């Protein structure tokens, strides 16, 4: 109990205590989006992929020395191993979220993609601490804290609707060959 009295009497400790409490309380709201690189998948996608592989292997019942037969049209086209790999690429499973490869192809850079909530809260708390040097201006300090939290969460990211709308516009635009 004496610790809380000491914190309440010291304005600097009160600010730091308030920032720590806000960081802990807002933890569920700052979720790190799952990042896709190459063929990486979410744990659920790995489980479904493994289940499909096990089912496929159990159906085919191949012995270790046997090769799986390719469909006829692929057999005729492929002459070497490299051509087989070009003709039959493994398709990754679909996952929710933003694909980094798509954003890099379109030249868009999402600034806060993958930022964790501690870095966002550090920015917000720093803004709060700088603006609240005078404790009489607590309303401005609290508003700046909330604005800092809001912009670290939503300020630099594009919504899925705007990204999908841009993709539709780029598909619908006819290209002139003149």
From Swiss-Prot:
The principal localisation class reads: endoplasmic reticulum
Where found in the cell? Endoplasmic reticulum membrane
User: Where are the membrane-spanning stretches?
Assistant: 13-30
Could you tell me which residue ranges are on the Cytoplasmic side of the membrane?
1-12
Q: Which UniProt keywords apply?
A: Endoplasmic reticulum, Membrane, Signal-anchor, Transmembrane, Transmembrane helix
Give the record's membrane topology: Single-pass type II membrane protein
Lumenal membrane side: 31-178
Task: List the GO cellular component terms.
Answer: endoplasmic reticulum; endoplasmic reticulum membrane
Question: What does this protein's UniProt record list under function?
Answer: Has a role in meiosis.
Q: What is this protein called?
A: Meiotically up-regulated gene 95 protein
Q: Which organism is it from?
A: Schizosaccharomyces pombe (strain 972 / ATCC 24843)
């Amino acid at each position: 109990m004496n610790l809380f009295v000491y914190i309440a009497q010291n304005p600097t400790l009160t600010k730091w205590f308030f920032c720590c409490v806000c960081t802990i309380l807002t933890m569920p709201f700052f979720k790190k989006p799952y990042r896709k690189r190459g063929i990486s998948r979410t744990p659920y996608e790995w489980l479904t992929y493994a289940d499909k592989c096990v089912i496929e292997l159990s159906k085919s019942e191949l012995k270790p020395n046997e090769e799986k037969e390719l469909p006829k049209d692929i057999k005729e086209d492929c002459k070497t191993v490299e051509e087989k790999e070009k003709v039959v690429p493994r398709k990754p499973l679909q996952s929710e979220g933003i694909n980094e490869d798509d954003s890099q192809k379109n030249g868009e850079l999402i600034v806060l993609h993958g930022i964790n909530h501690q870095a966002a809260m550090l920015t917000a708390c720093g803004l709060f601490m700088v603006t609240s040097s005078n404790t009489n201006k607590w309303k401005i300090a609290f508003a700046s804290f909330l604005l800092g939290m809001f912009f670290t969460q939503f300020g630099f990211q594009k919504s899925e609707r705007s990204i999908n709308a841009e993709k539709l516009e780029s598909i619908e635009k006819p290209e002139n060959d003149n």
